[in-house]
């Protein structure tokens, strides 16, 4: 085959004409210091705060400190094999997690990667873990109840959908138990639950997942975990990741319940990170913006207006106190951010009152509007009567000769406390709560021995289920106790008492 030189020339000229030079530019920097899950990188002049950075070995990091000549970042993975002098590239993105329906029923880490051994998760895309909270005009007031199934809470400290209610108490007082009971009680109520475990032992999280599975609650739940063995940055981003997963459902008009267990460990993880990247310490060695990390997280809980789909995200953050000290830095911060708190006391817990809720200093600032009217009617005087009982009980220890009125109040108080006791993983339907609290508040239990109250409650509710199911149904339908319902309920109580006292 003979090719003429001029043909070769024209082919080369053609190729040169059509050649497009593409340069891929990557903003990169050099590691000048690494250790303890923290790196300092020289360069990266265009880096954004919170930006995702790519380190060698497919490890990612997050830029936190933008200084004059270097960037302080935290690693979202192992620093093994990464050394000084290695190249770090910008990604131009901020930290994102997968969202979607397929996350339901799964256990994932802070980055949304499955850790339950059930294979990959199909997602509906990725969303940034840090987004602004809904504005005032996008919200509506809290007006729908979120039933916890716990008598002491639903009657005296009601929670509404879209509220932020803090659960606070010492270690081993039943804080997580209240949160898990609330998740179990959402069965069949079309609420998606997200449990975020921050700095917990892996064995504890495994127990919680087993409990939720046994109770059938994993069918509508997501568990996000950053265990105690994981790095501080992963513990720090866990609640934001969980919140983003929840917002996906809220924006679709669904109702979401999210539990942060617990924000004390979250603050400690943030303090660790901040001190390592040499931010100046403040009170209790926490950095100055520790209030802001919790306020921007909890402000994302909302009840959206009808125009925005009417979805809601209810947050139950948990805080662990030391020796009941609610005046410490982190507890006071979170109390001031939330719409109320459920305070659990060690003394009550050890005295056998479980859940160990102290109604004196527990409060719900917005949930009262969401409580159903029938519950308001029966529990209106409950908090006051319990407070009076506690006061009288402390005086009664000193004097033996008490007048009849005081004795009657003490006897009633004992029965009210007994009625508010409840076993773990046994949430109660709201109509049943109303019936038994009505009986206690209206003096129907004064002739029942205190030791028999639990037995009376169990048998009474079974009796109402079999003989007077229409009363419970009427309470749910009407949502108010009218005279007709009251007289039907009273006659049913009297009827059952005759059988019980035989």
Swiss-Prot record:
GO terms for molecular function: ADP binding; ATP binding; proton-transporting ATP synthase activity, rotational mechanism. It is found in: Cell membrane. InterPro entries: ATP_synth_asu-like_sf (IPR023366), ATP_synth_asu_C (IPR000793), ATP_synth_asu_C_sf (IPR038376), ATP_synth_F1_a_nt-bd_dom (IPR033732), ATP_synth_F1_asu (IPR005294), ATPase_a/bsu_AS (IPR020003), ATPase_F1/V1/A1_a/bsu_N (IPR004100), ATPase_F1/V1/A1_a/bsu_N_sf (IPR036121). The record marks 362 as: Required for activity. It is an enzyme of class 7 (translocase). Its EC number is 7.1.2.2. One of its GO terms (cellular component) is proton-transporting ATP synthase complex. Its main location: membrane. The keyword Cell membrane applies. ATP binds at residues 169-176. It holds the Pfam family ATP-synt_ab. It is a peripheral membrane protein. Keywords: ATP synthesis, ATP-binding, Cell membrane, CF(1), Hydrogen ion transport, Ion transport, Membrane, Nucleotide-binding, Translocase, Transport. It catalyses: ATP + H2O + 4 H(+)(in) = ADP + phosphate + 5 H(+)(out). It comes from the Bacteria. HAMAP family: ATP_synth_alpha_bact. F-type ATPases have 2 components, CF(1) - the catalytic core - and CF(0) - the membrane proton channel. CF(1) has five subunits: alpha(3), beta(3), gamma(1), delta(1), epsilon(1). CF(0) has three main subunits: a(1), b(2) and c(9-12). The alpha and beta chains form an alternating ring which encloses part of the gamma chain. CF(1) is attached to CF(0) by a central stalk formed by the gamma and epsilon chains, while a peripheral stalk is formed by the delta and b chains. Produces ATP from ADP in the presence of a proton gradient across the membrane. The alpha chain is a regulatory subunit. Belongs to the ATPase alpha/beta chains family. This is ATP synthase subunit alpha. The gene is atpA.
